[in-house]
UniProtKB/Swiss-Prot annotation:
PANTHER family: GDP-MANNOSE MANNOSYL HYDROLASE, MUTT_NUDIX FAMILY PROTEIN. This is RNA pyrophosphohydrolase. It comes from Dechloromonas aromatica (strain RCB). The keyword Hydrolase applies. A motif (Nudix box) lies at residues 38-59. Residues 162-182 are annotated as: Disordered. The gene is rppH. Belongs to the Nudix hydrolase family. RppH subfamily.
Length: 182
């Protein structure tokens, strides 16, 4: 389902733990990391889509999280032509997203990357709030920056400058879903 401009309606999810670190998922069989996200189905509200995607990609249920906030409007990014399937070229431009900021009220062990038979991620970790800006694929970077900047006001920590970050290795402490099931 595309809008008139060629954007697919979508939700993005920034999931925080009690230390305001964000969930960061490694796409299955790839070396790219991202926030959970997914399309809004016809007849679905953004919130319904968010809870469905949260379960499909992270294995969390509504009782495992609390909604802290959401973006006021749609944030858009264009997908480079070489990433677009041939049959969609000419009509598909990219994604338009409503972003949700969630707090995990459950435990880390509630995360289940294999909750469905089509997992999106094969590993995950908690990252400092701003680290994804340096690690996400280039064409999503501006939307990530817009979402993180708009939603940071719902979190309780001081922010020094537009991209305050602790010194942290972006991919230390990765949780491999295979290892975590043992």
């Amino acid at each position: 389902m595309l809008d008139r401009e060629g954007y697919r309606p979508n939700v993005g999810i920034i999931l925080c733990n009690g230390r305001n670190e964000v969930f960061w998922g490694k796409r299955i069989r790839e070396h790219s990391w991202q926030f959970p996200q997914g399309g809004i189905k016809r007849g679905e509200t953004p919130e319904e889509a968010m809870f469905r995607e949260l379960y499909e990609e992270v294995g969390l249920l509504p009782e495992h999280v609390r909604i802290l906030g959401r973006t006021k409007g749609w944030l858009r990014y264009e997908v480079p032509t070489h990433w677009i399937k041939r049959e969609w070229r000419g009509s598909y431009k990219g994604q338009k997203q409503i972003w949700f900021l969630l707090r995990l009220v459950g435990r880390d062990s509630d995360v289940n990357l294999r909750a469905t038979n089509k997992p999106e991620f094969d590993a995950w970790r908690w990252n400092d709030y701003w680290v994804p800006l340096d690690a996400v694929i280039e064409f999503k970077r501006l939307v990530y920056e817009q979402a993180l900047n708009e939603l940071v006001r719902f979190l309780d920590f001081d922010r020094k400058g537009p991209r305050h970050k602790k010194e942290q290795e972006p991919f230390s402490d990765v949780v491999d879903s295979v290892r975590s099931e043992e």
